[in-house]
Each structure stands twice: as C-alpha cells, then as structure tokens.
Amino acid sequence: DETPYTGWLTLDHKTYYLGENGVMTVGWLLLDGNYYYFSDSGEMQTGWHFISNNWYYLAKDTGIMYSSGWHADPETQTMYYFYSWGGAARNTTLTLNGYRVKFLSWGGISGSTWLYRDGSWYYVKKYSCITDGWHQIDGAWYFMNADGAIRQNESFTYDNNLYFVNNSGKMYQNQWLNWDGKYYYLRSWGGAVQEGWLKLQNKYYYINEDCSRKTQEAFQYDHNLYFVDENGVMI
C-alpha cells in the first residue's frame, strides 16, 4: 500500500496542505502555533478576508494569520489592531497601553494615537505611523526612525547636530544636560551648542569638539591661556 502524501503541496503557483490520509485541508488550519486559511478548493489564502463577520489578514508570503497586537498592512502601511484570535478590531474603542483608541467600522484608527509594538512606541496619524525625522506632538518633539519607532533615552547626530532624547522620547531643549558625566548645552530647537565659546547670563563657557563643555581645567585658545572652574565658567 502506498502511504498518502501529507504536508505542504504547491501546484500551478497555488499552495495546499494535505492532512491525515492525504486529505486536502479547507477552512482554518492550526499548524506549529500558526493559523492558516484555505478556500473550499483547498488553496491557501493570503491578504484580507472577511470570514464569519470578521476581517482577518493572512501574510502575503507565508499565509500566517496576523494576531495579538498591532500590524501594518504591507501595501498601505495602515495600522490595524488584531485580537488574539485574529480578527481585526473595528467599530469599537479599546484601552491599549494606557491610550483610548477608537477604531472605525473598517478597522482604521479614528484620529491620532500612540501605540506600543514590539518594544517600541509609534505615533499613528491618518491611519499610518509617522516616520523619518522630527515630529512635534502635543508640544514636545520626537524623532522617528524609518520604521516609525521613536528614539528613546539616547544621543544621536542628525543634520550635523547633536541631539538628546529622554526615556519618553522627548527632545531635551534650552538647558544644560548631564549625559554620561559630561555637560552639554541644548539650544531652544534642541541641537547641542558646538565647539567654541558660549555666553549665557553673562558667563562664558568653552564647548569642546564633541559638544561637551570644558570643566575645571586650563587650556589654550587663540594663543591665550584660559581657566574654567568646576561649573565650566571662565575665571
């Protein structure tokens, strides 16, 4: 007796799954912790599908059902929230990571909101995550990476200027900042003052090449000897 073929099968660019005794799978399949959906003809489905009055998204490359959290539509970059069982949230309001999020009838987000995904914070505006560069939100400035994740608790250079953001991702501005034991002065627009003399409230400070201030040392500048105290003020 021939043992019937079981497992994945691709024919004419269509994918099927043959279960026990070689029977072709239709409907939902749970395999290795992932859900897949097959049409009545047995073809694995991908993309959006309306099943039992709910919208589901099945990954284009694998057919795996999206579930448990935020996912972006790969084509439109629109953000959707999927329940643990796979359906997309729609026509409802949920509290997610402390934010009340209203979902429209088709699943898009009404208005704007912060969202937490894969260990990072994102901001959704007009259905998609804003990306690439500085954005002002509720009066504070945040820097978004290319994928939309905000930078948090770090220093970085952008357009030849040094910036710092706190644990919440907010840009430090208009202040002295102690960062890893060095002091930096951040201008009103956030960029650190660069190399040279800085005058603040009738006091002079000298800023090093790395944008940190000199502290408690003697140094030469333009063939002259200068001294600064423990607070960086020129004596």
What does each model-identified segment do?
Residues 1-235:
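Extracellular adhesion/carbohydrate-binding repeat motifs centered on closely spaced tryptophans
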